[in-house]
Swiss-Prot record:
Name by which UniProt lists this protein: Heme A synthase
Topology class, membrane: Multi-pass membrane protein
Listed Pfam families: COX15-CtaA
Family: Belongs to the COX15/CtaA family. Type 2 subfamily.
Protein species of origin: Anaplasma marginale (strain St. Maries)
Main location: membrane
Subunit organization: Interacts with CtaB.
Length: 341
């Protein structure tokens, strides 16, 4: 069945907005703006402070946070406005993305431009979007209590929900756009390719742990860490008794290790699968690796770090596209328009 052009465009817009949201979220984190708004008001919060009195009230709320006491006690009102506006844009864009995604679903369903299976799939995405927003606030709350930073575990959870949401959206878009499973490959090679894409997801989550711990601000050389491939501190007995994912050295080393593993595993895929999608995925993996190294040696330059974060999603998108093109031996070809009427 022919995909409805409007549905395809809508899904493409939602995917693009999700990537832009990732960029905005990265900039929010890198500029330490995320804790500047201390309340979660999904409806009232659409309107920003108006007038100096309103701004001073918001700054007074910020003054009660650990971040203010430890890092920003001398912040001026103008500087506070700057970080507040960044977080405000982050939240406002999230609301806009939710509206752009959710509002057309009833129309497309009633006019039978999408079938029940696709409606169910899209409702799962909507649920993930709501969970992602709630997780964002749950993450922010962790930085408003004792420490002047959010929990790196909650940050990783926040990103992981975005990964799930984007993956389903992107897969739906590819099917609507007519991408078919036309290249036959062995089960072993298919599952190897899928495992490399899975490693990419794991690496993105590890990147969130690195970001949450500010681990990128240390060991700013590559490939050595403190003059060695494997730093001596990794052999500490204390590290292996429950503190591994809390340790800056361990988390950064793990992020480096998985990055190299992905490059090594992705390198043979184009020769095994013989598809342009595999070459595109390998190119994205290589560029993402170089962006990661550049971010590290630049001591987390904001532009490089933001590009590194969003290009992780581009690499994931290339991986999902690669898998969509593959058909395992013995399976039937998957139509590029499943779920569309």
């Amino acid at each position: 069945m022919k995909a409805h052009f409007g549905v395809t465009v809508w899904l493409g817009v939602c995917c693009s907005m999700t990537l832009l949201m990732v960029v905005i979220g990265g900039i929010t984190r890198l500029t330490h703006s995320g804790l500047s708004i201390t309340e979660w008001q999904p409806i009232v919060g659409v309107v920003p402070p108006i007038g100096d009195e309103a701004w001073l009230r918001e700054k007074e709320k910020y003054a009660q946070t650990p971040e203010y006491r430890h890092r920003a006690a001398d912040i001026s009102l103008d500087d506070f406005k700057r970080i507040y506006i960044i977080e405000y844009i982050h939240r406002l864009f999230g609301r806009a993305l939710g509206a752009v995604f959710c509002l057309p679903i009833p129309y497309f369903a009633i006019t039978k431009r999408i079938d029940r299976a696709m409606v169910a799939k899209l409702l799962i995405v909507a649920l993930l979007g709501g969970m992602q927003g709630a997780m964002g606030w749950f993450m922010v709350k962790s930085g408003l209590v004792d420490t002047p930073r959010v929990s790196h575990y909650r940050l990783a959870g926040h990103l992981f929900l975005t990964i799930l949401l984007f993956s389903i959206l992107w897969h739906s878009f590819l099917r609507c756009a007519g991408v078919r499973s036309t290249t036959t490959t062995t089960n072993a090679r298919f599952f190897t390719a899928a495992a490399v894409v899975g490693l990419t997801v794991l690496q993105m989550v590890l990147g969130a742990l690195v970001a949450g711990l500010d681990a990128g601000l240390t060991y700013n050389t590559f490939p050595l860490m403190d003059g060695a491939i494997i730093p001596q501190s990794l052999f500490s007995a204390k590290l292996w008794h429950g503190g591994f994912l809390h340790d800056v050295t361990a988390v950064q080393f793990l992020h480096r290790l998985v990055a190299v593993l992905i490059v090594v595993c992705a390198a043979p895929l184009p020769f095994w699968l013989k598809t342009r999608g595999a070459w595109l995925f390998l190119a994205c993996v290589a560029l993402q690796f170089l962006l990661g190294v550049a971010t590290l040696v630049s001591v987390v330059h904001i532009f490089l770090a933001a590009m590194h974060q969003v290009f992780g999603f581009v690499t994931l998108a290339a991986g999902v596209h690669m898998l969509c093109r593959l058909r395992r031996e013995g399976s039937t070809c998957i139509s590029g328009h499943a779920g569309i009427s």
